[in-house]
Amino acid sequence: MYGLAQVPVTERTMLEKDEALKPANMVTGRLGGRYVGRNRKWQGIPSLTRTRGGRLYVCFYSGGEGEGAENYVLLKKSDDDGKTWSEPVLAIDPAGNVRAFDPCLWTAPDGRVFLFWAQ
């Protein structure tokens, strides 16, 4: 593969230079700070999926004043057909100057739930 100047581009050099190509960090534990509902100024692009067992998952993105590198993706679940929902968990918050947006949930035919997003 070659870059614009016909210079060979390897996977390694691409990963070193483009923050968006680095895998997102997994986050566990309780949410605090900017992730807490009272500190979120907006949220958008919800996606919903249902598992074989009936559990609903919804995800959406938020963070910062609008679209930008402060964006992250949150995930909630419901076991009563959406009457009540869990507190959100942080699913995606890329490091560096990378925006996470447009999340999409999908339940595969084998029952696994996938979360896709753009960054």
Task: Identify what each model region corresponds to.
Residues 3-119:
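Asp-box/BNR beta-propeller blade signature and adjacent active/binding-site loops
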